[in-house]
């Protein structure tokens, strides 16, 4: 099954299981065609040529692995990742995380820990990120905890965790650009 969605801005998907992101291929067409140059019959022309287009694709990709390799390369391209970052705040937030080889990084934390400490707790960092970027509806801790491991796969990062007496510790730390970009400052 092929679903083609054409839009001027990146589409947002509520699915956090990874089902859509594993299958979605983003192709950008950034060039805007001036209104006076647009073909009002374009859709009908494409529909009329669909059989030829499909036949051409079938001839071009006689080996399914060739087509799959090209689609997967586009799926994980920098261009596609930038579009996903602009469409999904969690993908954008995860782009500001750096993986560690062991779970010695940020603790997950929760919303009740006061004062907020985004340099120590992953969930606090996420809340600070959302506030700094003007996003009005952050995820609950439970939804965040379920979505982060799947979202990190966009960056080919596996989340490692361990239980400690201070809470659950992750294999993530904040990247250096967070300090200047969105972390709260302590300019006394």
Predicted regions span which residues?
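Feature primarily recognizes SF3-like P-loop helicase cores of small DNA viruses
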Residues: 1-188
């Amino acid at each position: 099954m092929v679903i083609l969605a054409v839009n001027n801005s990146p589409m947002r998907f509520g699915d956090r299981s990874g089902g859509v992101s594993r299958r979605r291929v983003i192709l950008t067409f950034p060039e805007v065609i001036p209104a006076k140059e647009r073909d009002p019959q374009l859709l009908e022309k494409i529909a009329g040529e669909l059989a030829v287009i499909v036949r051409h694709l079938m001839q071009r990709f006689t080996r399914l692995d060739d087509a799959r390799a090209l689609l997967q390369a586009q799926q994980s391209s920098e261009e596609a990742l930038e579009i996903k970052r602009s469409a999904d705040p969690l993908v954008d937030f995860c782009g500001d995380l750096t993986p560690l080889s062991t779970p010695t990084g940020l603790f997950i934390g929760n919303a009740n820990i006061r004062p907020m400490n985004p340099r120590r707790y992953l969930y606090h960092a996420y809340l600070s990120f959302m506030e700094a970027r003007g996003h009005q509806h952050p995820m609950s801790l439970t939804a965040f905890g379920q979505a982060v491991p799947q979202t990190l796969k966009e960056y080919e990062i596996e989340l490692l965790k361990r239980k400690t007496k201070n809470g659950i510790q992750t294999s993530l730390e904040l990247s250096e650009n967070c300090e200047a970009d969105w972390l709260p400052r302590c300019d006394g």
